[in-house]
Structures are given as structure tokens and as C-alpha cells.
Amino acid sequence: MTDFWLNYLDNPTLSVLPHDFLKPANNKSVEGTYTFNIDNGSTDFKFGLAVFAALVYRLTGDEDIVIATDESANTPEFIVRLNLTPELTFQELVSKITKEYENNISQINYKALSEVSHRIKEAKGLDENPGLFRLSYQHAHSNQQLNTTVEGSIRDLAIYTDGTKFTIYYNALLYSHERVVICGEQFAQLTTVSGDTDTVIAEVFLITDFHKKNLPDPTIDLDWSGYRGAIQEIFMDNANKHPDRTCVVETVSFLESNSKTRNFSYHKLIKLLIVVGNYLKETGIKKGDIVMIYAYRGVDLMIAVMGVLKAGATFSVIDPAYPPARQNIYLSVAKPKGLIGLEKAGTLDQLVVDYISNELDVVSTIPQLKVQDDGTLVGGKLEGADNDCLNDYQKFKDQPAGVIVGPDSRPTLSFTSGSEGIPKGVLGRHYSLAYYFPWMAKRFRLSEKDKFTILSGIAHDPIQRDMFTPLFLGAQLLVPTADDIGTPGKLADWMAKYGATVTHLTLAMGQLLSAQATTAIPSLHAFFVGDILTKRDCLRLQSLAENVFIVNMLWSLSQTQRSVSYFEIKSRKADPTYLKNLKAVMPAGTGMHNVQLLVVNRNDRSQTCGVGEVGEIYVRAAGLAEGYRGLPDLNAAKFITNWYVNPDKWIEQDEANKKSSETSERTWSVKPRDRMYRSGDLGRYFSDGNVECCGRADDQVKIRGFRIELGEIDTHLSQHPLVRENVTLVRRDKNEEPTLISYIVPKDSPELKTFFADVDFPLKKSNDPIVKGLVAYRELIKDIKGYLKKKLASYAIPTIIVPLVKLPLNPNGKVDKPKLPFPDTAQLAAVAKLSVSSHDAQAAEEENLTKLEEQIRDLWLDVLPNRPATISKDDSFFDLGSHSILGTRIFTYEQKLNVEIPLVSFKGDQRRPRFPIGLSRYNYSRREQRCRRFLKAKTYTMRRSKELSKELSKSALLESYSSLKQLPSGSVNVFVTGATGFLGSFIVRDLLTARNKNLDIKVYAHVRASSKEAGLQRLRQTGITYGIWDENWAEKIEIVLGDLSKEKFGLDNSQWSDLTNSIDVLFTMVLCHWVYPYSQLRMLNVIGTINVFNMAGEVKLKFFSFVSSTSALDTDYFVNLSDELLAQGKNGISEADDLQGSAKGLGNGYGQSKWAAEYIIRRAGERGLKGCITRPGYVAGFSKTGASNTDDFLLRMLKGSAELGLYPDITNNVNMVPVDHVARVVTATALNPPSSEELTVAHVTGHPRILFNNFLGCLKAYGYEINPADYPVWTSALEKFVIEESKESALFPLLHFVLDNLPQDTKAPELDDSNAAKSLKQDSKYTGEDFSAGKGVDLDQTGVYISYLIKIGFLPKPTGTGEKKLPEVEISDESLKLISGGAGARGSAAK
């Protein structure tokens, strides 16, 4: 093979189309299909391929598109790889496709595409075959399917076409049927441009008429003039109505014995904040001035904020934990006229004090605001003053400042990251602070009875929601201590103790809430979070609070204020299975009341995107923030006038609706503005209008709840004197945690040498640039991190900084980010080892760590994501690459020494906590232990069964077997085991009725019974149960008693001799049981089989027939082999296959016992045994009356689906054959073996095979109220039906099986049945009937089964009228009596 494919397929992008469900583990797939037609004539294949490529580009945003295709139905697959750009026209795309397609056909020098995969694996030294594609577009053919035989590749979606008809095969575990239907509609919509090939591919409108109603209309009114009033006035109104109601509760610290709970009523707080408001107003603060608050979580913050608002000013908050240099940056942006320091926030750093004195014009200051235990408010003494600054203003506590504000007055200044290293200040509006609360109260069941928490970051704008929501509702606000927040497990205790009902948390705080928590919080019913929310986070929270509804309010930004999206996750109590089929990351949802999320085409802003198409998210609402402070150009770029509608429309409407009572407020408002905020986030619509976020259009990211501007990090990095080039990315580490990593190129200078360590690298690592850079420049990395600490918040400092000789560039001259490697575990381990200099090692030895300190050091090494070279006493847990969420893992060890360690102990100086922390080895959970034991037992059982089979084939077989060459004419004696089973009874029927004109057959039936009379009665009863018994058979049946598991069945020599000298043909069937392990089935199914065929070694020559099962083929090997054979134009698995493909991997004892028996029979065949092994699949009911074994998987599926009203839309072929035809094949192959020279195998396969969903869907055709559902949806509905609603279901005994991976478990290989057809043809000379064409189960046959099942009471009658009428079937009263008594529900002899 040439190197063309090796180069062509180097590092391909395997596009994943937008999907609906969590990506399945182990690449599981469930095949679903959808067919549509293109009405505008036949579509040229290459044009269709171009349309598909364009659709993939639009739905994924990937520019590197990789699709598998073919030249015709019978030619090898090959890959077409395209680089698409948004300006491409369809004419250019078709030309590009045609060139690639025709060139790549000429490069096909292989028989199968797997050869290319093998070649790449060998050339690159990979452990496994690489994936070459996930999507394909191919010519229609007879074996089209989702599964691919290309090793290493997993196909998610495939389109097969003949030019007019298009069939999509898709993984139903990834995509809902509705999603695929939409893809088909969008494909058809894209083909309409064929008449205008100059259309740009990125500008074709993808919204179909059917889904337009579910997507937001960007032209409707969003209540631009719906101002509800200022939050401070609403708060005052609540205080007047309910003065004695508790407003704020500051709770006691569990670590401070002298602390106490403090309660503040609405009336008390109003008095205090009026004092603050009047002080600010009287000391020079004017409407719209900014007042900066140095904050601390407590009632003091609430008083300061509301006091600023009462003065008509704008409040902004600084967290004292920020570095002083960064505090100064915030001050430089805000330019405040007033300052309020909370006493508990501590004193200002001198650097900040100097900046305020020298750079700001501050007219009003409250230096140390505090509410004392007696309820009095103090503000601290100003410089040079003798009295408290608020003393003279206490008299105003009953006289509000009287400042009137309007909807466009600016109450808040919040900060967000800045790409130039300077945070941006965002001015909020009063319109937003209260507008959405009435809707939220109704939608999320909030009221004045709720108890809210204040847990958001004190300098982050979500804390506004924490405070203002309860104040609007007249509810209560609970304030925790830092110890409650910082100690894992205690936050849950605190919530439960104080009865918190509603909480707003960042994702990071939510993780702290669930970390090590054991206390349930039944009172909590609403949990609001604004972040990328994962299923794991939801499950953790709901394990603590089963009544909690989690509401993700994404885009709760400073820029959008309260105008946000929401997605509600139902509580575990309301719907235990709700989360099961959601993806790992929760959707962003849809806009709340009068808020729209518009996903806009990035290449044509006049269009909103279609379902699934990647676009940029704009938030349209009346409640957007005013804009960025002092940044008019940025405001113009981010706060954009809606271009979908004329803005004058709303101005005219507002003027017409103006009321005279609004005059004072309108003084402080502007005209209605229909604006959109350009979020910079990429997203796509679901079909129901919900939005999922799928990345950023810029370089802003969110880690652990903090929004970080990568450009800001890079700006500061570039200003370090020893950094020449740099770029910062977010990559996932080995634990799938998002990690900040910066790549730098050091600036060559004399100073650089002082930061360079000359290391003697081992030969193995001498060529690894990552290891060399991290080791040689470790001192430079420390210096850079120290430098960044002074410029950035701690969460924005890169965890890893990788020095490189140069940054890789792509052909466009930009940094080639995909080629920037994340150091793997082996590299980091090498760095840790090589970084320990002799000085470091000596210093570590001289530290003389105590046993406790050694334990703590080892614990840190266990927890830290990237192992450091050394840890000294002066190192910080956080400086070594950790963060507060990761810190909670340390507390998994605290129970060993019975200590509680508040996370706050890591902060402050951020040194090692001074607490004894024990270590423990990782122990597998009980579930993991059970899984390991099961897998071990399964592997052992299969290996043991194989070993025992080999041993028995040597020790238990006769030296030789002399067999018949052909069936004797006239009288034939047949020995049958399993005659009282479902299939066995029909074999007896066939033997005694089908050939009675040409053969005189007598049946020797082995029956387990106390006497021959009792045995005959058992046989008779079985025949009557299934409606097939003829009393005339009794004289043709001889009952044989004995134990098949014993040699000679336990008979004496005389009885054994009489039996063996009488028999011409031996039939053996075995116990069918899906639960018993191999060890329980071995004696009967394996040893019993040996004892039966050893009869063939006695004096009289015999044929031998063994009824096996396709269960012996139930491994992935045969499913894949079947696909390969069908692709080669063959019929399926050969009857000559030796079954080595299932020598391992069979999942149940029944299949293992069949495999073992077949293995031993083959060895006997090598010693002369003649006859046939016959393998049926599912044995269905009697074709004439529908008589069935009701304890059957397929019939349970039929009944269970009817009960549920849903059936799984699984498109696997089902190899089910009516029992009378299976019996005919078994008797034909026994009496007329396919070969007289050797032991052979015959497959029983359906002609035709019915699809699984068509079989279950037959119910609808006959009048049942039932609909198809994607498998994940069906499993959730079934689980809810059985478990939550406690309803009886026919599927209850099989619940573990049907809920696991039914589509994969019911996938069966296609089978070649040439030998079966040959025997049936030969048998026609006896029967007069030629059944060599085979039989199967179709819609009409299923109707017979349904009628039978209704008549015996297994199925209810249909409630509706279907397209087909159920046929009449006859069942005798005697049969019905036996069935009602429990007969007819035994296992059959085959699958």
C-alpha cells in the first residue's frame, strides 16, 4: 500500500453531529433508520455527497470534514476529506468534492478499508486501529446498515441512496428519531439550491416550516415598558406591610463557641439602611454616582447595598481577597465617588489606600460599617474625627432619602474579564432587578414562606439575585459562616438545620455543598445555578435533596442582569429517571419570561439558525444591562439594536400607551430599546426550542464557575520580561478536569540564563521537548506564576506553563493550537523525577518532616492533579496546582482520625493545614467488586467449559462410531429427548404425521416420570395444551424412562441392549434455561448429550441429530463476520464454521453448554458419527393456531410493550421461525442428513426475517394504542412504569436484560442455511411437500399469534380499530383449561 492514505488521513477530524443522549460507554450502538425521498428528481451522487458535507459543516462548525463513501454498491469504501470555508459556493463545493472523489478512487489499492487502518496503526506504532470516520454517504445496497467492518471506526450515522430514496441509519443511543427526521428535512432543503449553484453554503436557510413554531420569533414585543419599580422601594413596601417578619438571619459558627445567631426584621433593616442612604446623600453622593463596597458576607453587606440604592447611587463590590494591584484596577474602572468598608472585611492594603488618596476623587466614606449585637449601626471613625461617622445621621432613620429612580437608572456596577488585562465594568439598570421575580415565583413555586441563602461570591453579580429575590417576595435570607461554607459536609448540615428552601449557587459552591455531605436536606425545593452544569453535579445534589428542582440559569451575566435562560431538572422524587437519558452536560434551555435566546448564523446575521446548526447566541430582552462603563465602541459591538424589526415600532407603541402616573419615573428612562446582547457563546437549538451551548466564539472560558478571559492571561504573560511568545488554552487533564495551560517561548537574554537549569537528561527523554522545557525552565515557571499572582485572581493562574523552543504555526501563520500537546502522565512523572536537583533533595532531607507532615505531604501528592517534583514546608497547596474544589478530596481521609477541617484553613496564607490527616488506600466500591467477581467468574466459566469439553472429548467418547449411510425404508424407530417441551412436542407431531404415507415411524420418547403410563400422560397433556394431540399417536409411542446424565441412562444391560438395538435415529434436545450457569446445565446438556450419541456406537447403525441453538453464536465476532460475508455477497455465517469465534465471549450458561456439546459432538464426528447438528433461533408459535410458549422473551416484549403503550424502535432482524417449521427442519435434517459422509450443521433462519420494531409494531396494525419510541426513551418509560408507578409488567423478570443494551443484545448474525434447504428438498420424497424455501414470521403471522394470546388471556383485546382485522383461531376448551392451570409456559429447547 502506498503512503497516500497514511498522509491523507493524518490526524483527521471525526465530526460528531449534534446528539440528544449521553454518549454511550464502550461505543455501544443501537441501529435506527429513517427513509425520505427527494421529490425534485434523481439526485446526482456526488452532488448529494456535497450536500451532506455542507450539512455536516453547518451542524458541527468543523472545517475539516471526513466522510466515508464508495464508487458503487459492490466496491470498497474510501474516504473523502474536505476543508470547507464559509464563503464556498455550492458550485465550488461540488467541484471540490468531484476532484477529491475521483482522485481517491484512483488511489484504492486495497480490498477493504480496514487495510488502511492497519497500515496507519503499524506506521504510527499505535496500540489500536485508529478511527477513520464516523459518518458515511454511500450507494444503496442489500446489506446497508449502521455497523461497519472497518476496524477502529465507529459509525454514528450513514446515508444510503439510489438518487431518489435516502435511508439514514443512525445510532439511536445518540440521536432521537425526531433529530434524524430534521436532518432529513435539512438535507432536502439544501438540495433545493441545485438550481442556483452560486449560493454560498453557509447562507442557505435551514429552518423548516415544521419547527419554526418552536423557535423564538425575533420580531415580537418583549414588554419594553414593563418596569415594575425599584427594588429598594419594593423592599420598603414589604417592610411596611410585614414589619415584624424576619428578613435576615446570621447563623452561628459551629467552630466558634462564643458566636450566636442574629435575627433582623424587615422593619429593623429599613431603619438601618435609611441611615446609610441619608449619610451618602448628605455627604455629596449624587444620583448615578458609584459607591464601592469592600465586602464581607453578612447583614452588613445587605445594609450597605440597599443604603446605596436608597441614595439613588450605583453600588459595586470588591472582594478583599483579591490582590491589591487588582483591587486598584477595579477602582480605576469604577472611579467611585463613595467608599464603604465593612468592618469584617478587614483593613485596606496600603497600596490600595495610596491609590485612593492619589488617584480618586472620593467625597463620601464609611470606613468600617457594622451592625452591633444590640442592633445599632456604626460606621467607624473618619481620619481626624472623634465620633462615629454615622452618629449625626441616626436621626434620619425614619426619613427616607426620597431619591426617585427610573427603569434606566443604574443601580449596579459589576466586573467581567477584560481581554486587554483590564476588567470591564458593566452598568446595570433598575428595570431588570425586579421585573422577572413575579414570573420566577410562579414558575418555580417561590413565595414569602421560603428561606433563601446567600452563598454566591461576594464580588460576583449573582449575589444580587441572592439578596434581591427574598427582599422582593418578602421572604427570609439565611447567612452562613465561612466555616459552614468551607468545611465539606457542613454546608448541607447548615441548610438542613435552618430549613433552607431555595439556594443560588455557582457550580463550584454546589460541589462544595455535596462534598462529603451525608445530611439530607428535605426542605430544599429549588436550586439555582448559572454555569455549565453536568449530570454528575445534579445527581450529587439530588442525592442530598430529593425534593429539589435544579434550575440552570445560564447567561446570568453582568451584561444580561436577570435576563437569562433557564433549564429545569425535575426533582428525584417527581421523576427518578429524568436525568437518565440527558447528556453529560445540561442544556442552557430557553429564555425565561420575555427573554429570547437567538442562535444566529455566524455567516449571515439576517438568519437565525435551524435546529442543530451551530451559531452565535444573542440574548434579546428588555432587561439587558445599560452597557460597559466608558467603552462606547465595545457597547456598539456587544449591545446591538435588533436588526429583525424597526425599533421605531416600539417607541410609537410606548408613546401610545404612556400613563400620566409614570411621569416621575420616566424622567429617568430612555425610549424603548429593542437590543440584543452578543454573548460570544456558540450554541444550537434542540427541536423543542431549547438551546445547548457548544463552545465560545472568542477566547473566554469558564472553569469551576469563574469566567476567565484567556486573552487577559495572555496579555499579562506577554508583559513578563522573559516571555517572547505565549498562548493560553483550556485542556482536559487525565481526570477530564478543564485545566488552564500556557505555552511560552522564553526570550533569549542574559537574564534568562539565571533561570535555566542544566540537566543531564537520560537518552530516552533527551528528545522530548515538553519534558526538557518543564525541567530546564522550572525556576522561570515559578517566577512567571509569582508574577501572575500580582496581576490575576488565583483561579486565572495557569496550572501548567510549558516552555517551548517555538510555537507551531498552521499554513495561515496562526498558532496551530491542536498541535500544542498536553503533558501526559508519563511526561509529568519524568519531569517530577528529573526536577529534583541535588540541592532540592538535600533540602528535603534536612527538613526533618514529622510523621504527620509526611502523611500530609503524601496526601497532597495523591490529590494534586500534576505531581510536583518536591514538596517543602513552605509550599502552598494551591500554588502546587490545586483549587478549592479539588481540596475537598482531602477530606475523604479525615474520618480516619475523626477530625473536621474547614477549607478556610487552606486560605489566608494558603499554607498546609495544621491538622492530622490520615491516608487510606483506594478501595473498590462494592459494585466494582461485584463487577470484577462477575467478569472473573464469567471468564473462568467459559475457560473451564472449554477445558472440560476437551477433557470429555478424550475420556468420554467411544473409539469409533459406525453410522447409517441412508435411512432404512419401511419402518424407522426414532429416539427423542425433550419430547414434553414446546419444540419437542411439535417434533413428535411432525415425525408421526408428515411422512406416514411413506414411512412407518415409531417414537421412543424419553420422559421424566414415575412410570411409563405417567410419562405418556405427560406427553399427551403437552400435546393437548398446544392443540396438536391425536390419541391415535399413543400406539406409535414408546415411553423410555431413565436418567440421561447417567451412563446407559441408569438402565440395566438388558434394557439398554433392547433400546440400542431398536433405534435407527437419535434426537437429543437439552434443557433451555437462560438463568442457570454452565455448572448447573453441564450434566444434562453436555453429559446427557454424550450418553445419547454414545448409543450410536452400539451394534445397530444410527443417524444422530442434535438440536442446538444460535445461542452458540452469540458473540460480537459472529455479528461482525456476518457483516463482512454479506458485504462479499454471501448469505451469512457458514454452516461449516467451527465455532472458534465463540470459544470465548458467550454470556450465559445456556449458550456455553450448547457450545461445549457441539465441540464434543464434532470430535465424535471425527470418529465416525454421522448426522446433523441443527441450530434454530427464536422458536415462534404454531403457524396455524398461534399456539405458543408464553414464557418467551419475544412474547413478553409484545405484552410488556402493549402494557406500556410504547415499543422500542429497534431495527435488528429477528430470526424467529414458527415452531412447526423448526420441527420440520429438525426432522428433515435428522432423517435426511445433508451429507452421508460426515457430520454436518444446518441453520434454521427466517425467510423472511422480521425487524424487531415491525414485530412489536404489529400491535398498532391490529388496533392497539401503541407508538414507537427511541430505545433510551422507552427504557426510561418502562423503568418509571415498573419502579416508580409500581405497575405490573410482563417484562419485570427480564428488566435487567431489556434495560441494559437490548439493541446490542438482540443483534443476530445472518445465517447461511444451504444444508437445511438441501435436507428439506430431500425430505419432500417422504412428505410430498417442498419447504426448502423456508418460512418466517410477517405481519399476518403475527396476527395469528396475537389472536391466540388474546384468547388465552395473555394479551388484552385491542381498544381501537387497526388497519388489519385479527384472524379467528380455534382453541379447544380442554386446551384452555390446561393453559389457565399454568400449562404451556415452560421453556423451549432452543432460543
UniProtKB/Swiss-Prot annotation:
GO biological process, one term: lysine biosynthetic process via aminoadipic acid
NCBIfam families the UniProt entry points to: AA-adenyl-dom, alpha_am_amid, Thioester-redct
Subunit note: Heterodimer of an alpha and a beta subunit.
This enzyme's EC code(s): 1.2.1.31, 1.2.1.95
Protein name in UniProt: L-2-aminoadipate reductase large subunit
Protein's UniProt keywords contain Phosphoprotein: yes
InterPro entries: AA_adenyl_dom, ACP-like_sf, AMP-bd_C_sf, AMP-binding_CS, AMP-dep_synth/lig_dom, ANL_N_sf, Far_NAD-bd, Lys2
Cofactors (names): pantetheine 4'-phosphate
Family according to the record: Belongs to the ATP-dependent AMP-binding enzyme family.
Entry keyword annotation includes Phosphoprotein: yes
Location of the Carrier domain: 847-927
Catalysed reactions, as listed in the record: (S)-2-amino-6-oxohexanoate + NADP(+) + H2O = L-2-aminoadipate + NADPH + 2 H(+); (S)-2-amino-6-oxohexanoate + NAD(+) + H2O = L-2-aminoadipate + NADH + 2 H(+); (S)-2-amino-6-oxohexanoate + AMP + diphosphate + NADP(+) = L-2-aminoadipate + ATP + NADPH + H(+)
